């Protein structure tokens, strides 16, 4: 990774670090589960990964703004992600390792 790339990605990495710090320190004290899937902190990490710092933070702020009794919650994926990405599935595996096709 070049120095230019490192500087470009630094704000995103700092934001992700703050989210991880929140998850390790403050979140366990709150105790109440998130009404959304994925959780707000997981949503924020995915938004930062896919959209970088500025757009990722904007999406996160919009998501946190939905957190209240006026919104029913539910599944709310980061734009441009799939359900597999939301579930953190790195790869879909095929149970048939023989290579035979069953037409």
Swiss-Prot record:
<dbReference type="InterPro" id="IPR002696">
    <property type="entry name" value="Membr_insert_effic_factor_YidD"/>
</dbReference>
<dbReference type="Pfam" id="PF01809">
    <property type="entry name" value="YidD"/>
</dbReference>
<keyword id="KW-1003">Cell membrane</keyword>
<keyword id="KW-0472">Membrane</keyword>
<keyword id="KW-0997">Cell inner membrane</keyword>
<comment type="function">
    <text>Could be involved in insertion of integral membrane proteins into the membrane.</text>
</comment>
<protein>
    <recommendedName>
        <fullName>Putative membrane protein insertion efficiency factor</fullName>
    </recommendedName>
</protein>
<comment type="similarity">
    <text>Belongs to the UPF0161 family.</text>
</comment>
<dbReference type="GO" id="GO:0005886">
    <property type="term" value="C:plasma membrane"/>
</dbReference>
């Amino acid at each position: 990774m070049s120095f230019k790339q490192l500087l470009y990605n630094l704000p995103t990495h700092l934001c992700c670090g703050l989210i991880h710090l929140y998850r390790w320190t403050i979140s366990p004290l709150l105790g109440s589960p998130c009404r959304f899937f994925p959780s707000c902190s997981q949503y924020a990490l995915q938004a930062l990964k896919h959209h970088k710092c500025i757009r990722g933070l904007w999406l996160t702020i919009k998501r946190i703004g939905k957190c209240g009794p006026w919104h029913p919650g539910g599944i709310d994926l980061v734009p441009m992600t799939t359900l597999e990405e939301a579930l953190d599935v790195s790869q879909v595996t095929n149970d048939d390792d023989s290579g035979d096709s069953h037409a």
